[in-house]
């Protein structure tokens, strides 16, 4: 996606590390100053390319490159096309590699060292993997980036999937309010050195208060008022999510399922800009 470089460069402050990949201003090495408040609304949006169709994903990435901040590629696409497919679709476009690693520490560490070679802006793991796994993930991302001579991606933890409600958690033995579990996992991730979490819109304000202003909140479950909620139970509008304290928004079917994906993306951005 050659014109993706222009989209990525639109909101760049600098190149980080010794590699040549482009990264948004807020995506930097641990301890460096973040600047998410300086990003324009469109730069905060990552569009989920949840498809196994390579041509479709590539077309969406190309059409949206100048309209949003990046793309999210998950397990459906990755299982079908692997690393080469990711490179073909997301080359030059800021990438959220959403593979939600959750395994024993050594396995997760090895997977992340390999994932770093794809130069993602964000990668993620399940916070429920526990402290040892999370600490191994932090170390693996740093070492993998150094060894591969590329910038270190931001490492995020998944707290509780947006498709789950309190009844669902009870069925798998997690007792207590869902929001308490989300905060517990977010605090664990922060203590282990991760850069942020993936959380639902309903937990944004609570996690911002609990984890502070420099902890990245990547928020799926984003649905404009004119879009249907689908299978996610904890959703909100883009404007409300940013107002609550989200840093980045993941938008999927409201854009990719629209008759004109580019027009849908423009509509979301315009609504955000109108809200100021």
Question: Where are each of the predicted segments found?
Answer:
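Conserved anion-binding
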Residues: 41-42, 103, 107-113, 118-195, ...
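A C-terminal functional module that forms or caps the active site or interfaces directly
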Residues: 73, 83, 200-246, 250
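C-terminal helical cap(s) of enzyme catalytic domains, especially alpha/beta-barrels
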Residues: 134-138, 255-276
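Short, positively charged and aromatic/hydrophobic N-terminal segments
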Residues: 23-30
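Conserved, mostly hydrophobic/aromatic
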Residues: 47, 71, 100, 123, ...
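Glycine-rich phosphate-binding active-site loops on the catalytic face of alpha/beta enzymes
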Residues: 120-130, 224, 234, 238-264
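Acidic (Asp/Glu)-rich catalytic clusters
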Residues: 61-66, 84-92, 113-117, 141-143, ...
């Amino acid at each position: 996606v050659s014109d993706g470089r222009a989209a990525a460069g639109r909101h760049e402050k600098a190149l980080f590390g010794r590699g040549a990949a482009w990264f948004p201003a807020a995506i930097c090495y641990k301890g460096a100053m973040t600047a998410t408040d300086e990003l324009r609304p469109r730069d905060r949006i990552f569009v989920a390319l949840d498809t196994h169709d390579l041509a479709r994903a590539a077309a969406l990435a190309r059409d949206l490159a100048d309209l949003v901040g990046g793309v999210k590629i998950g397990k459906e696409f990755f299982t079908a096309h692997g690393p080469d497919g990711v490179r073909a679709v997301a080359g030059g476009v800021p990438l959220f590699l959403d593979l939600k690693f959750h395994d024993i520490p050594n396995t997760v560490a090895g997977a992340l060292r390999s994932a770093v070679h794809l130069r993602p802006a964000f990668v993620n793991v399940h916070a429920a993997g526990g402290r040892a796994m999370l600490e191994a993930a932090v170390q693996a991302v740093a070492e993998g980036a150094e060894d591969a001579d590329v910038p270190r991606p931001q490492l995020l933890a998944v707290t509780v999937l947006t498709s789950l409600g309190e009844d669902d958690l009870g069925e798998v033995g997690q007792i207590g309010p869902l929001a308490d579990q989300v905060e517990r996992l977010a605090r664990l991730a922060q203590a282990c050195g991760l850069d942020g979490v993936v959380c639902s819109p309903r937990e944004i304000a609570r996690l911002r208060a609990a984890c502070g202003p420099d902890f990245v909140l990547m928020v799926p479950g984003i649905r404009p008022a004119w879009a249907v909620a689908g299978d996610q139970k904890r959703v909100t509008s883009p404007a409300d999510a940013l107002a609550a304290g989200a840093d980045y928004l993941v938008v999927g079917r409201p854009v990719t399922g629209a008759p004109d994906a580019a027009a849908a993306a423009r509509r979301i951005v315009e609504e955000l800009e109108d809200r100021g």
